[in-house]
Regions:
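N-terminal leader/targeting signatures
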Residues: 9-10, 242
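Sec-dependent signal peptide recognition
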Residues: 2-9
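A sequence/structural signal for flexible, mid-protein segments enriched
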Residues: 19-258
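Compositionally biased amphipathic helical and low-complexity segments enriched in hydrophobic
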Residues: 10-12, 175
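C-terminal motif of bacterial Sec signal peptides marking the signal peptidase cleavage site
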Residues: 14-17
Length: 258
């Protein structure tokens, strides 16, 4: 008999993290228990990784972050991530991610049952917002896209903020991989509560194609789960041996006071 499995990962505990833009769907199907891994690496920031088990629906839901894993990220050297509650996720390293002479990262995990989980990711080049503006209830951002297709995946987020509270947040997943030359582009979103805001925070992330596919599938899974409890949408991650994502991104942020 087939069983349903639930990724027990409540990401609202980790709101200081920069990814993902979508909450995780609670549902997953599979024949055997699996692991769920998320790791978003950003140059200049410490490494952080979330690892948890996917348990059968017959078991009580509980926070069950595994601390029995050997986690290593290979950059210009091997960096061990250790378990602990002081990190953003449940594995981390105080060592910051510095881009020197590398263009990719590799993840190597050995679980308590000696299962191997691996993944690799490229390191996107730095991204920069050219300018941004607010016109009525529109939040408009402009930035230069790359001539290289694999560098043209982005997440644009606009937040209307009042007294340190987010009144409204809009997220766009941008695929400009079909563009063949560098050039200035713009994207606008509508923020309904913009008249009550004190400032608009513009955030632009350059992400990998794997991360783009993952975030889009995450959004689709959430949409499906809102309308159906029986038809899960698979997540398009890049891990071998587990669900989830191992990826790298770069970011730029600007604030427009109102």
């Amino acid at each position: 008999m087939k069983h349903r499995y639930y990724p027990i990962l409540l990401l609202y505990f980790f709101q200081v993290a920069c990814m993902p833009e979508e909450d995780l769907p609670i549902r997953h199907t599979g024949e055997t228990p699996e692991y769920f891994i998320e790791c978003y690496c950003q140059p200049g920031r410490p490494f952080a990784l979330s690892a948890t088990s996917v348990l059968p629906v017959s078991e009580d839901l509980q926070i069950d972050f595994s601390k029995e894993m050997k986690v290593t990220i290979h950059a210009d050297k091997a960096i061990s991530l250790i378990p602990g509650s002081e990190f953003i996720y449940n594995y981390g390293s105080p060592e910051k991610f510095e881009v020197r002479y590398i263009d990719s990262l590799f993840l190597d995990i050995t679980t308590i049952d000696n299962k191997s989980i691996t993944a690799s990711t490229s390191i996107p080049p730095a991204v920069s917002i050219y300018n941004c503006q607010v016109a009525g209830n529109e939040a408009i951002i402009r930035f230069y896209i790359s001539e290289k297709a694999d560098e043209n995946y982005y997440i644009y987020t606009a937040e209307a903020v009042h007294a340190d509270s987010i009144l409204n947040k809009e997220v766009c997943y941008l695929d400009y991989s079909e563009f063949q030359q560098e050039g200035l582009t713009e994207k606008s979103v509508i923020l309904p509560d913009i008249g009550q805001a004190e400032e608009i925070i513009f955030t632009l992330k350059r992400i990998t194609k794997a991360n783009y596919d993952y975030q889009v599938s995450l959004n689709a899974a959430n949409t499906a789960n809102q309308s159906s409890i029986t038809t899960p949408v698979p997540l398009k991650g890049n891990l071998q041996g587990a669900l989830g994502i191992f990826t790298c991104y770069t970011e730029d942020k600007q604030t427009v006071p109102l």
